[in-house]
């Protein structure tokens, strides 16, 4: 794999990570707790899900989806259901994690990591990204070193991007403003998650 091919891969992964969606909403939700550890756990668990997709892309993800279209539909429906579940909870929330922290009910790092991992592994958008845009790079790699680099690139790009988002969102000045509007943010993220769930259902039906 030449440097130019790797840079193309890096650019595609960065643009994919930067695109707004439910992943950012979940990282934002957990960073609002005031604990960077929660946000970082969400970010790197999300990146772990990205790494899983990168790994199975090496094993022929696009071919699997082509031969087993019901598998992609199953992932899409599961992802839509999970987004709807998160959206419903956000709409009912009275301040989300920030409220729980103020009441003394700390949100565990495991819970943050679990939501981060599930939001990536159950995302049909991410599945399609790897099947359509990532898989073509598989033909350009050979040997363990290049294959390791191919899996590590999207994992690190995603993890570092959401680490940056966590650090920005958990800065004291911004965090104070966000916590004042935690209920509004929860409502907006809830609506966005529900609309994304509906969009996924309509696109695969």
Give each language-model segment a name.
Residues 37-112, 198:
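Membrane helix-loop-helix hairpins that form the core translocation module of multi-pass transporters
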Residues 45-52, 113-126, 186-189:
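Select subsegments of transmembrane alpha-helices in polytopic membrane proteins
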Residues 170-175:
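Short, flexible, glycine-rich and Lys/Arg-enriched loop motifs at helix boundaries
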Residues 54-58, 122-127, 131, 189-205:
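Hydrophobic alpha-helical transmembrane segments in multi-pass integral membrane proteins
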Residues 3-73, 129-154, 163, 167:
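Juxtamembrane transmembrane-helix termini in multi-pass membrane transport proteins
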Residues 7, 11, 106-118, 148-149:
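Alpha-helical membrane-protein architecture signal
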Residues 67-98, 153, 157-165, 176-205:
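Selective transmembrane alpha-helices of multi-pass membrane proteins
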């Amino acid at each position: 794999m030449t440097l130019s091919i790797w840079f193309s891969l890096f650019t595609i992964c960065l643009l994919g990570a930067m695109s707004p969606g439910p992943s950012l909403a979940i990282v934002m939700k957990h960073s609002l707790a005031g604990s960077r550890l929660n946000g970082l756990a969400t970010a790197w668990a999300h990146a772990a899900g990205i790494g899983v997709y990168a790994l199975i892309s090496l094993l022929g993800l696009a071919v699997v989806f082509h031969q087993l279209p019901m598998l992609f539909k199953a992932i899409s429906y599961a992802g839509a259901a999970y987004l709807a579940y998160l959206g419903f909870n956000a709409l009912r929330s009275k301040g989300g994690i920030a409220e729980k922290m103020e009441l003394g009910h700390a949100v565990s790092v495991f819970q943050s990591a679990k939501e981060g991992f599930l939001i990536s592994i159950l995302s049909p958008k991410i599945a399609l990204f790897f099947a359509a845009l990532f898989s073509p790079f598989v033909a350009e790699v050979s040997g363990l070193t290049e294959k390791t680099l191919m899996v590590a690139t999207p994992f690190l790009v995603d993890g570092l991007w959401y680490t940056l988002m966590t650090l920005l969102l958990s800065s004291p000045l911004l965090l104070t403003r966000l916590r004042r509007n935690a209920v509004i943010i929860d409502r907006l993220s809830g609506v966005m998650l529900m609309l994304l769930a509906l969009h996924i259902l309509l696109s695969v039906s």
